[in-house]
A protein has these predicted regions:
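Short, well-formed alpha-helical segments that are part of the catalytic scaffolds
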Residues: 13-26
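C-terminal subregions of glycosyltransferases and related glycan-biosynthesis enzymes
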Residues: 214-255
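Acidic helix N-cap motif at the loop->helix transition within catalytic regions
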Residues: 16-18, 41-52, 94, 98
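Donor-binding/catalytic cores of nucleotide-activated saccharide
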Residues: 70, 91-204, 211-229
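Short aromatic/hydrophobic "clamp" motif used to bind/position activated sugar donors
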Residues: 86
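A conserved acidic beta->alpha catalytic loop
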Residues: 23, 37-47, 69
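Glycine-rich, basic loop-to-helix element that forms the pyrophosphate-binding segment
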Residues: 65-81
Length: 255
């Protein structure tokens, strides 16, 4: 079994998806890369996905589906994942290769003693035109390089966020908690990050600057004008997360 599956949701991503894929390939055959083509029709995304799958059959698989939005691409990745851990990397983002290799080595080591439910790392805001890249790290909130539970988590600063970018989840745990993101909805990465929390018992944090979160495309979901136009979808996602809280029974949880 592979140690890690990384799903790359792609929708008309020809211009940048190869940079994303190439940043992972040196991690080798312990990694499974799923390029999920979410019904791309305007460029060569499907052909690029198939070409990489043919060239690196021991690492890459191409998954083609009718357009269902980012959430359904994440769902498709999870359905097809064979790795012990699961991560999503958006097609316009990329990872630090050396950090990925070190994280995968630690995953293998952790598996020898039962593994963890959630592994966290750092991420970098890679904003076009910014003089300095903003690094999101968590040494103040999490023990470093040791297995721990929620009771040992410190306080996050107001500007610190646990997002899809810095999370690896145990694949079977995601399936056991029946994680399924809504179709044709933006900002569902918040649900991906949040919904599994009640099922997480063992965590591990590595102070690795792994994920480069690219900010700069005009059509990007985090573009201010785009976000204003999609406020209804943000409200929908927030309601879903509130419902998740309402479904949990915290009466038997340790304080």
């Amino acid at each position: 079994m592979k140690i890690l599956t990384i799903a790359i949701p792609c929708y008309n991503s020809e211009a940048y998806m190869e940079k994303c894929i190439k940043s992972m390939l040196p991690a080798g055959e312990e990694l499974e890369i799923l390029i999920v083509d979410d019904g791309s029709t305007k460029d060569r995304t499907p052909q690029i996905a198939d070409a990489y799958a043919a060239r690196y059959p021991e690492i890459i698989r191409a998954v083609h589906q009718e357009n269902g939005g980012h959430g359904e691409a994440v769902n498709a990745g999870l359905r097809n994942a064979t790795g012990r851990y699961y991560k999503v990397v958006d097609s316009d983002d990329w990872v630090n290769t050396k950090s990925l290799i070190r994280i995968m080595a630690k995953m293998k080591e952790l598996e020898e003693s039962g593994g963890v439910d959630m592994l966290l790392a750092n991420f970098v805001y890679d904003k076009v035109g910014a003089k300095h890249k903003k690094l999101m790290r968590f040494k103040n909130a999490f023990p470093v390089n040791e297995v721990f539970g929620w009771e040992r988590m410190g306080h996050l600063h107001e500007t610190q966020y646990i997002l899809m970018h810095n999370i690896f989840y145990r694949t079977q745990m995601l399936k056991d908690c029946h994680l399924e993101l809504p179709k044709h909805t933006f900002y569902v990465d918040n649900i991906f990050a949040f919904q599994p929390f009640p099922y997480v018992e063992k965590l591990y944090y590595m102070d690795e600057n792994l994920y480069h979160y690219f900010i700069g495309r005009d059509d990007q979901s985090v573009n201010e004008k785009v976000m204003i136009g999609r406020i209804d979808q943000q409200i929908r996602v927030n309601k879903i997360m509130i419902d998740v809280i309402g479904e949990q029974d915290f009466s038997t949880k340790d304080p």
